[in-house]
Regions:
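Phosphate-binding loop/pocket of nucleotide- and phosphate-handling active sites
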Residues: 9-31
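Short, small-residue-biased leader/transition segments that mark boundaries at the very start
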Residues: 1-8
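Short, flexible, solvent-exposed loop/turn segments with mixed acidic/basic and small polar residues
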Residues: 105-110, 174-182
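N-terminal, charge-rich interaction modules
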Residues: 26-139
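Short cationic amphipathic helices and targeting signals
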Residues: 117-119, 186-193
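Short, conserved charged micro-motifs
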Residues: 127-130, 195-201
Length: 214
């Protein structure tokens, strides 16, 4: 097919076949991912989850299937910001919209390709206890143990911390948290297989947090 994107796929019997329109499928996945993330943002706005947003604000990331690079991860340029309980975004989600978020997603996917969504929320003792009450699998990392070569390399801290938490825990958990460090706010990161699962987890945390009057 002249001018068409094509890829080679094994039939399963050792005979390769040509699968046309691979680029079209990828673009379809990108469009669905964009719609899913924008819908999630609208749900969070309606639920007024501002009480979960940390001082450094929040971002949400979603990797394409088989994501390999920053441009394969959808995130929000400028992050999600809060005003009281209300939240706002200054831009639509974009692929390659956040290197920091992409580093987390890509590191997670190296261990479990099915886990492609992440969102950071603020850390408090109460929120961590709520995550435990919800029976989430929880892991953590200690920023004070971050190697110097990682610390001085821009954007490497979250990649290192995510890797450390997962390898110590033994699998990809629902929650990865850290207690912060010098000029670093403590944080909880919610992990999920897709945006729908991520929304359910975050709303479960938010609703129990409000119910308990935290």
């Amino acid at each position: 097919l002249v001018g068409s994107e094509m890829c080679i796929r094994d039939r399963g019997n050792g005979t390769p076949c040509v699968e046309p329109f691979a680029a079209m499928y990828r673009e379809g996945e990108k469009l669905k991912s964009l719609c899913d993330l924008e819908n999630a943002i609208e749900i969070f706005k309606k639920e007024r989850i501002g009480n979960l947003i940390p001082e450094v604000q929040t971002n949400i990331g979603l990797g394409l299937s088989n994501a390999k690079q920053h441009e394969d991860v959808l995130a929000i340029p400028g992050r999600v910001i809060k005003n009281g309980e209300d939240i706002f975004t200054g831009a639509r989600p974009q692929f390659g919209g956040s290197r920091h978020v992409a580093n987390i997603v890509l590191t997670v996917m190296q261990h479990d390709p099915e886990k492609r969504a992440v969102m950071n929320i603020k850390y408090t003792d109460s929120l961590l206890q709520i995550c435990k009450k919800l029976k989430f699998q929880i892991a953590s990392f200690d920023r004070s143990k971050e190697p110097k070569k990682v610390r001085i390399r821009e954007g490497s801290s979250l990649e290192w911390g995510t890797e450390k938490a997962i390898t110590t825990y033994g699998s990809v958990p629902d929650i990865i948290y850290d207690l912060g460090g010098i000029r670093k706010e403590e944080m909880i990161r919610v992990l999920a297989k897709d945006i729908d699962s991520l929304v359910k987890k975050v709303l479960a945390i938010h609703r129990l947090y409000k119910k308990e009057g935290c």
